[in-house]
Amino acid sequence: MKFLNSITTLCIGAHPDDVEYGMAGTFSKCRDTDFVVLVMSEGGDWDKTTTYNDRKKENENVWSMFSNVSGVVNNQDFVKDQPEDDMINFIETNLSDYYFDTIVTTPQEDSHFEHRMVNHLGPALCRRDSKTLIEYRTPSTLNHWIPNHFEPLEPYNYEVKKAALRKFTSQQKAPYFNEKCIDSFHHNFLCSKKGFNMVESYRIVESYSI
């Protein structure tokens, strides 16, 4: 199965675990799509207990669970220290060997300002080509963000995702890594009425047929 008919999808996160928290179930489900994860910094301002190599290793441990996932971690402390044009240049230079038909970013309607900064990269990366642009839900996505695409997860896919999230060992004490919070993140009332108990949520911003 493919993710929205995509052959190769670029998934951009501001921090380690952003993409995986929002999309790891889709990685497990949509094995016919190749996903490239790009992490734009090593983590947040308040985490002084881990290094770039620590967080990079956590990401790599997750990516190794999926035959269709690879990734790059930008060796930068923060997103906020990177001008937008530098981030675009980094992406277009370091990932020039790929052709992405789909780009997925953090939402604009998000309480984390670095997520909003990463969201701005999407339209710039789609400026020349008919790429599909999508936002994935994060733990800090605001309530008035409205998804328009759901990926239902089978129990197997969901268990794979939870196992993947456990590999972010440095983050296990964060409230949003609590199992009840993770379960709540994947519930949608309207989807549950239709028999889909666990879903990942997306907002398609702009879509083109492939």
Stretches found by the model and what they are:
Residues M1-E135, L190-K194:
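Active-site beta-strand->loop->alpha-helix modules in alpha/beta enzyme cores, enriched
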Residues M1-K2, S64-N68, Y98, T102, ...:
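The feature marks non-catalytic terminal segments
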